[in-house]
């Protein structure tokens, strides 16, 4: 009987047993020797039912599964196969001990009882039951994120130590498989977005901004991995030697990863990978000096610290438009044609190519009404140059686009509008005062008090923007980048992070998020657009009220801990004069 039971437990068939409703039971014709023995035998051979269910799942596993966590389900099949192999080995050892009357198992008696057999198989009974629970739960998951989350929930929700160990073993096996797949993801273009979003984040196509991440991933890690992949796919085409060297390093790093994975360990892995990519690929194409030039251009052109840029741009637009209007009748065609010419001539006249190198090729001048350009932002923020609402954009090419994301590009375009509107309004008031002298000389005298107040306010705001915020923060950024370069610890992720911190600080201190203040400033700009030097006295002027409201908006920042108190207080003191 014992031999028949062991054969049955190992997956063989036996005439002494029947299968009923998925359960294997002792045949009714077989009469047990003692009362209760049938129930005990049926309890022992229940392992055969469990083994059969697991084996069936392994055998019918669909290699063509379209589930996004397919590679994890394959890992589950391997884990189940491994456990069944160990189970079969233990049965073979058990039968050997019975046949040889091994005293370790048989003891002092001559025969092995069913109770001894049951006790010996108790651990496997628990293990096979746990494997079925594991298989049932995981096979229902459709994504990588949900699979790892399910494992986490099962681990945290169980009070049984052995089950926790099994779940942890499964999790480590899955994570090892995930790491292997990660390397393949980083170096191969599968062209399957659904795989990428599930692989990194969950059940959404917008995988870069997904909040349902794999438990050991953060959004920063996801962004870093996507950047690494972009670099590797580009290197695959033009840097074969570097690509192969980095790939070998990737496999070494993955092999050395401690399990189970944590956010900290995966962050370190992504950082080391990006460091390799930076050294071997990125800075071979985008040198430190070019990044340094880009930073200078961001400050001087995009943030308009170069006071000659906007006036020159306006002058060029006026001249080029005059040339084109003589040969073109359609205004839309004229604008499309002349803006690239205007920018090119402005760059040439100011010799910006000498100053910033090839970085000037990243600049693009567009009309605010260009609906095809996805980077156009809010219509509430406009800069009027010679009657046309223009916007200067940054169109960075790889690998320069690793220095800042699309959101940062949009911020620079908005800051160009914000600072440009400020600059043009100050120029407008100054021109009014300049022309006023001629009218005053002819005996025409008009009240200009509100314009003086407005000029004082806008000039104070401009001085604060450049002397207190932009110049110091970008000077510090360049010094930090230079220090990294000198210590030979330059990595693109560090450059990008330093720039992001600088831009975040500048945005905050330039009141980028204060819509109330911007509405008030836009009201000032709108009123100024109504003025003509000879008509100032006829305008129903509300400038003083708008200036007063703007100052009040700034005063409210005095005790706000999120602002740099020293410089914000200096501005408030100046505005209180």
From Swiss-Prot:
Query: Where is this protein chiefly located?
Result: cytoplasm
Q: Which UniProt keywords apply?
A: Cell cycle, Cytoplasm, Cytoskeleton, Microtubule
What GO terms describe the biological role, i.e. biological process, of this protein?
Answer: astral microtubule organization; cytoplasmic microtubule organization; meiotic cell cycle; microtubule nucleation; microtubule nucleation by interphase microtubule organizing center; mitotic cell cycle; spindle assembly
Q: Which GO terms describe its cellular component?
A: cytosol; equatorial microtubule organizing center; gamma-tubulin complex; gamma-tubulin ring complex; microtubule; mitotic spindle pole body; nucleus
Q: Name one GO molecular function term.
A: gamma-tubulin binding
Question: What Pfam families would the database entry show?
Answer: GCP_C_terminal (PF04130)
Q: Where in the cell is it found?
A: Cytoplasm, Cytoskeleton, Microtubule organizing center, Spindle pole body
Q: What family classification does the UniProt entry report for this protein?
A: Belongs to the TUBGCP family.
Q: State what this protein does.
A: Required for proper anchoring of astral microtubules at the spindle pole bodies (SPBs), during anaphase, ensuring correct cell polarity.
Q: Please state what the protein is called.
A: Gamma-tubulin complex component gfh1
Q: Which organism is it from?
A: Schizosaccharomyces pombe (strain 972 / ATCC 24843) (Fission yeast)
What gene does this protein come from? Answer: gfh1
């Amino acid at each position: 009987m014992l031999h028949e039971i062991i054969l049955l437990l190992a997956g063989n068939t036996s005439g002494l047993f029947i299968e009923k409703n998925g359960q294997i039971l002792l045949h009714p014709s077989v009469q047990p020797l003692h009362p209760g023995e049938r129930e005990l035998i049926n309890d022992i051979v229940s392992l055969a039912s469990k083994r059969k269910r697991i084996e069936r799942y392994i055998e019918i596993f669909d290699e063509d599964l379209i589930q996004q966590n397919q590679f994890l389900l394959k890992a589950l099949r391997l884990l189940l196969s491994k456990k069944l192999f160990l189970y079969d080995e233990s049965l073979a050892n058990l039968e050997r001990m019975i046949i040889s009357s091994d005293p370790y198992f048989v003891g002092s008696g001559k025969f092995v009882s069913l109770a001894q057999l049951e006790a010996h198989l108790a651990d496997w009974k628990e293990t096979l039951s746990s494997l079925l629970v594991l298989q049932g739960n995981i096979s229902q998951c459709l994504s990588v994120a949900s699979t790892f989350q399910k494992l986490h929930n099962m681990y945290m929700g169980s009070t049984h130590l052995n089950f926790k160990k099994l779940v942890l073993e499964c999790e480590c096996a899955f994570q090892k498989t995930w790491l292997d797949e990660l390397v393949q993801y980083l170096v191969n273009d599968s062209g399957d977005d659904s795989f990428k979003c599930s692989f990194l984040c969950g059940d959404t196509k917008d995988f870069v901004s997904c909040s349902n991440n794999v438990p050991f991933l953060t959004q920063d890690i996801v962004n870093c991995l996507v950047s690494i992949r972009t670099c590797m796919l580009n290197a695959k085409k033009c840097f074969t030697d570097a690509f192969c060297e980095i790939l070998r390093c990737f496999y070494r790093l993955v092999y050395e990863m401690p399990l189970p994975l944590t956010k900290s360990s995966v962050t370190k892995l992504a950082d080391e990978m990006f460091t390799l990519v930076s050294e071997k690929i990125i800075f071979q194409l985008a040198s430190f000096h070019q990044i340094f030039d880009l930073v200078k251009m961001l400050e001087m052109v995009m943030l308009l610290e170069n006071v000659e840029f906007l006036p020159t741009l306006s002058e060029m637009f006026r001249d080029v438009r005059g040339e084109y209007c003589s040969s073109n009748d359609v205004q839309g065609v004229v604008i499309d044609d002349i803006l690239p010419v205007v920018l090119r001539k402005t760059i040439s006249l100011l010799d910006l190519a000498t100053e910033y190198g090839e970085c000037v090729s990243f600049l693009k001048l567009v009309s605010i009404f260009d609906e095809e350009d996805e980077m156009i932002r809010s219509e509430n923020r406009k800069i009027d140059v010679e009657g046309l609402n223009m916007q200067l954009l940054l169109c960075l090419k790889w690998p320069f686009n690793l220095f800042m994301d699309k959101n940062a590009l949009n911020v620079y375009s908005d800051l160009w509008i914000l600072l440009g509107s400020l600059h043009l309004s100050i120029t407008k008031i100054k021109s009014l005062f300049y022309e006023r002298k001629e009218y005053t000389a002819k005996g025409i005298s008009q009240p200009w008090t509100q314009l003086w107040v407005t000029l004082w306010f806008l000039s104070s705001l401009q001085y604060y923007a450049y002397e207190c915020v932009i110049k110091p923060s970008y000077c510090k950024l360049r010094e930090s980048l230079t220090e990294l370069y000198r210590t030979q610890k330059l990595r693109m992720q560090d450059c990008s992070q330093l720039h992001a911190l600088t831009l975040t600080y500048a945005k905050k201190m330039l009141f980028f998020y204060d819509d109330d203040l911007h509405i008030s400033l836009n009201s000032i700009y709108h009123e100024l657009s109504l003025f003509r030097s000879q008509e100032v006295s006829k305008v129903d002027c509300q400038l003083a009220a708008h200036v007063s409201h703007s100052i009040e908006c700034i005063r409210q920042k005095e005790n706000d801990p999120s602002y740099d108190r020293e410089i914000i207080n200096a501005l408030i003191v100046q505005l209180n004069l």
